[in-house]
C-alpha cells in the first residue's frame, strides 16, 4: 500500500509537470519523430499497468517496430474492471509542444519509469470522462500525457533497447487499444514533419462512436487544456465550450466521484431511481459490472428526464412567445380594422360633400347660362322693337293714301283765295235751309268786320264742333251746288277719315268745318 500511495503521488506530480509543459503559450516546443502507434503502445503499456517487469520494457523496441494495421483493429483489453475502459478514443492530435527549457534529469526519469513500470491494481487506473459516458469496449485516450513525456522516455529507453534482447514471445502479452479505422488512418497518415502550430486543432468526433446517453454538447473542434490537480485521475479531455445542463445538473453525481476507491455518495434522484427500478444502491468504490450497468441505466434515464424537461421548458417558452405574438398581432389587427372603418366613414362623408358641391356648381352654371340667354333675348327684342318703331315712324307719314294728303294740303292755299274773294258762293251757301239761323244773325257790314267775324266764328265753331259733334256726317253737309273740285276733295277726305279715325279725326273735322264755314259765306 505504501508503494501504491507513493506511486499515486508521483503520478500526481507527473501530471502537474505535464500541465505546465502543455501551456498553449509555449509554441516553440520540440517536434517528435516517434510514430503515433508507438506512442499509443507506450501508453497502453505504462499507464494501464499491463506490463510484467523490466525485461519486458527492454524488449519493447522490438514490438514497437511492427506498425498496427489501420484496417484491422487490435483485440479489446480483457480486464476485471472493463467498465473503466468504456470511453471512446478522443480525437485529439498526438503532437504536443514541449519547451526545451523544461527538461527532466535522469533521476526523475528513472523514478517515473519505475512507477510506470510497476503493475498497479486496476482500481487505481480507473478513468471516466467528466462530461460523457461511453459504451464499453473502447479504451480512454490520454495522448496529451503521453506526448508530453515522449521525449524523456525516448532518451531513457534508448539504452534499455540496446541492452535488452528481443524476445518475440512477449509480443502476445502486449495489450492493444481499439480505435476507429478512420481515426487510425487519420493519425497514421499524419506526418510529424507536417505538424505545425496551426494544425494542432483536433478533428471532430464521429457521431457513431457516441452512446445513447452521451451528451453530444462537445465542440466539434475541442482545444487542449492543461491538467489541474482536481483532474489528476481523469484523462486530459477538453471541456465543452457551451453550457450543458446535464453535466452541471445536481441530479447526477459528478463523473470523477465515480472513480477510484472509497465511499460512493449518490444523489437523491439516483437513489430514488435505483430503488424504483429495483436495483441495490452501491455504497463503495470500485463498482462491479452489475452495479456499473445499473448505475449507467439510471443515469441515462435521469439524463433523458432532464433533457425532456429542458425540451418541454423550451417548447413552453416558445409557445408563450407565439401566444404573445398572436395576441399582439390580433390587437394590432383590431386597431387597423378600426382605422379602416374610420377612413371609410370619412371617405363616405367626403364623397357626399363632393356630390353636393357638384350639384351646387352645376346649378349656378345653369342659372348663369339661363340669365345670359334671357338677357340676350331681351336685348334682341329691344333691338327689334327699336327697328320697328323707327321704320313705323318713317312709313307713318305716307299712310295708305299719300296722294290725297298731298293734294289736300296744297289746295288749301288756292281755295282760300276764291272763298275770300268770291262772295257769290258764300252767299249761295248761306241761303241753305239748314243754316237759316246764320243768315238771320248776320248783318251787312264792312269787309273788315266780316273778316274778323269770319275768323272768330270759325274758331268758335271749331271748338264747339269738337265738343258737341262726335260724329260727322259728311254727306249731310255736302251740297249739290258745290263745284266738282270741292266734291272730289271731300270724298277723298271722307275716305281718309274712315281709314284713319284714330289718328287724323280731329284735324279733318277742323278742316271740314272751316271749309264748310267758308263755303257758306
UniProtKB/Swiss-Prot annotation:
Keywords noted in UniProt: Activator, Developmental protein, DNA-binding, Endoplasmic reticulum, Glycoprotein, Isopeptide bond, Membrane, Nucleus, Phosphoprotein, Signal-anchor, Transcription, Transcription regulation, Transmembrane, Transmembrane helix, Ubl conjugation, Unfolded protein response
Biased composition (Low complexity): 208-220
Originating organism: Rattus norvegicus (Rat)
Modified residue annotations for Phosphoserine: 93, 191
Region (Leucine-zipper): 336-357
Post-translational modification: Upon ER stress, translocated to the Golgi apparatus, where it is processed by regulated intramembrane proteolysis (RIP) to release the cytosol-facing N-terminal transcription factor domain. The cleavage is performed sequentially by site-1 and site-2 proteases (S1P/MBTPS1 and S2P/MBTPS2).
Keyword Transcription regulation listed: yes
Cytoplasmic side: 1-378
Subcellular compartments: Endoplasmic reticulum membrane
Chain positions covered by the region annotation Basic motif: 296-325
Glycosylation: residue positions: 505, 518
Positions of transmembrane segments: 379-399
Official protein name in the record: Cyclic AMP-responsive element-binding protein 3-like protein 2
Family (UniProt): Belongs to the bZIP family. ATF subfamily.
Keyword set includes Cytoplasm: no
Residues in the Lumenal compartment per record: 400-521
Membrane topology label: Single-pass type II membrane protein
Subunit structure: Binds DNA as a dimer.
